[in-house]
Amino acid sequence: MTWQQMAEVSYAVERGALYLVTNRDLTIPRELGIAPGCGSMIQTVINATGVEQIASAGKPESAMYDEARLLAAGNETEPVSRESCLAIGDRLDTDIEAGNRGGYDSLAVLTGVTNPHELMTAPAHLRPSYIVRDLRELQEAQPSTDASDGNVWTCADATARLEDGSLTVSDATDINALRAACAAAWTYADNGGDIGSVSLPEFSL
């Protein structure tokens, strides 16, 4: 979209036009790096006019997932059940939030926008049900995370410990350690702790 096209949208909105958007992704991953997404262009119009869009046809609304259930059902009268579906994506504030809003299990994949730090600090409405490095791990069962005591969480052979303002893990190259760290961080935040003040591990996955 060119500057002139953006300007024409702004002029129309200033004159009272209502507008809907396809999605609100601020960024999108491209071959050469991270590029501005539709949400960044929308924000330009909002900055110029002070007027928000009336709705989004895409995520984080769950309508896209609901429609997919109907399409997948084919000629059946009932859509595919939510329990048989999995919302998959690389963005917490679109893909995962849409799944949570719609009542779907969700899976965050680390090959796109989201990084381990964002996962550990995610508020409840942005937290995925599952975490994988890449889509090849869809073929693998994800181990459960368990609290072995008040400060230590385990996932398979990996552990995460949160004490004295520091979250540490057994192996920062292990996806199970990230899963354990997320469980520890989320529990801490849900119990009223300030996860922003906690020293978090640097993962290399």
Roles of regions detected by a PLM:
Residues 1-205:
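Asp-based, Mg2+/Mn2+-dependent phosphohydrolase catalytic module
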